[in-house]
Regions:
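Extracytoplasmic
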Residues: 10-44, 62-65, 153
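Residue-level signature of mid-helix packing/kink "hotspots" within the transmembrane helices
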Residues: 27, 55-63, 116, 149-150
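Helix-to-loop junctions at the C-terminal end of transmembrane segments
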Residues: 61-73
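C-terminal ends and interior cores of transmembrane alpha-helices
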Residues: 83-96
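Helix-loop junctions at membrane interfaces in 12-TM secondary transporters
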Residues: 94-104
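Cytoplasmic helix-loop-helix junction between adjacent transmembrane helices
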Residues: 105-143
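Helix-loop-helix hairpin linking two adjacent transmembrane segments in secondary transporters
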Residues: 141-175
Length: 175
């Protein structure tokens, strides 16, 4: 296997892993709605507002994350996005106020998602793979996001039932 092909396969593999984790964790947040709202005595609106902010920032920040990836490299943007995502999960697990939940689940994770999901990762894959293999490579990485939902939800639910919502979020942040 030549070096270029090995490099392309590594980008596809690591890109798929990043998207699997990012999307798998993100789509598990609904499992936390009831336990967080019940334990902290909030209405569901606090958690829903935090996730609405997350979606808004995720969408708004993607063009900027893409521009940063073009300028500084996708790997750096993915690392920073992953760090923001991790920090958001850890802060979310320690949050006991509406503001804390909005800043962690909303702002930090929303910005983290912009650096760890499709816009940055697919851009890197598109640059690394030969044109005749590009569609297949992008399809594999995109499918990894769906696989993440399938694979991560049972584990997230298991952690939630075993550890409770706060410790489960801390454990997911450690991943």
């Amino acid at each position: 296997m030549d070096a270029l092909r090995r490099h392309s396969l590594l980008i596809i593999l690591f890109g798929s892993l990043v998207v699997t984790l990012a999307m798998g964790l993100r789509h598990g947040f609904g499992l936390f709605l009831e336990p967080i709202s019940s334990e902290l005595g909030w209405g569901r609106g606090v958690f829903a507002f935090a996730l609405a902010i997350q979606n808004l920032l995720w969408g708004l920040a993607q063009p900027f994350a893409g521009a940063l990836a073009d300028r500084f490299g996708a790997a750096r943007v993915v690392v920073v996005g992953g760090a923001l995502y991790t920090l958001g999960l850890l802060c979310m697990g320690l949050s006991d106020s509406a503001l804390g939940m909005t800043l962690s689940a909303g702002v930090l994770i929303g910005l983290g998602l912009s650096g760890t999901t499709f816009s940055v990762v697919l851009g890197a894959v598109g640059r690394a793979v030969a044109p005749e293999k590009r569609s297949m490579a992008m399809g594999i990485v995109s499918a990894a996001g769906s696989f993440g939902q399938f694979a991560m939800l049972p584990g997230t639910l298991g952690l939630l039932e075993w550890l409770g919502w706060s410790a489960a979020l801390l454990a997911l942040g450690a991943i």
